[in-house]
Amino acid sequence: MKKILAVFAVFGGGGVLMSADIEDSTLKAIFENFEKSSKNDSIKAGLSPRQIELSNLAVIIASGSLRLWQERVEKSELKADEIMELLRQSTAYLGMARIREFIFVTSEIYKRKGVKITDFALESDENRLKNGQNLQIELFGLATTDSMKGELTQIGKYLSQNCFGDYYTRVEILSLIEREIITFFLLAAQGDTSAQMKAHAKAIFLQGLNKEKLIALINANIALIGYPRSLNATAAVIEASK
């Protein structure tokens, strides 16, 4: 007889309702065995456990799995500032509407543990724009910023100032290659992001992670993301490498 345990966790103000947890020992064994073996294969391919964990966490956020996120954060060896920085960056690709509860729950975890999160002052609009554009050029070349004209002028400015200027610039917490890995897997987990995945795959190549390693990193996420989106992400990587 299957044991069904309904767990409701309500946090003040936000009111997060945790879904019912259906205990299935067969599925649990299959999932854990496959995830472990795929991660081991990726490590053999030259990836670090840190790179794998960052990609896994990005997939979990983009998939909206709040419970799994809580479980992984509780066990994570990443620093609190690194976890929170990953969440902040995710806001640019998923939006605050999807990230808010993750931020709230994560903050509660670190409050309970007595861990303080570092706050950072907001740069001026001019500096954020300039620094963001410089990072875009480093990652994608001049063509990217030059292409944002006409109807795309305003969103192009926001991309430079907000998406890159507000988040990517804190490379002392997460490096550029780590941020690109996070972004790629935020995109991969959403689906219908082939063009964006190709662009960020090219940026990852420029940062020193080759096609084979990026595909191995995708394989380390199949258990979480599923086969269709893993195949789509792999196709984008292959196309970007041509």
Question: Residue locations for each model-derived region?
Answer:
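Conserved active-site and cofactor/substrate-binding residues in soluble primary-metabolism enzymes
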Residues: R50, D81-E82, I177, D192, ...
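Short, structured motif recognition centered on aromatic/hydrophobic residues
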Residues: I52-I60, L86, E178-A188, L217-I218
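Acidic, glycine/proline-rich low-complexity segments that act as flexible tails and inter-domain linkers
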Residues: M18-R50, A62-K75, A92, M96-E178, ...
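Classical Sec-dependent N-terminal signal peptides that target proteins to the secretory pathway
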Residues: K2-A20
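Generic cytosolic/nucleocytoplasmic N-terminal low-complexity/intrinsically disordered segments
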Residues: M1-K2, E212
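Glycine/small-residue-rich hydrophobic helix-like segments
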Residues: I182-T183, A188-E212
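Short, mixed-charge aromatic SLiMs
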Residues: S76-A92, A203-A216, N221
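Short, thiol/selenol-centered motifs that function as redox-active sites or metal-ligating centers
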Residues: S55-L68, A189-Q196
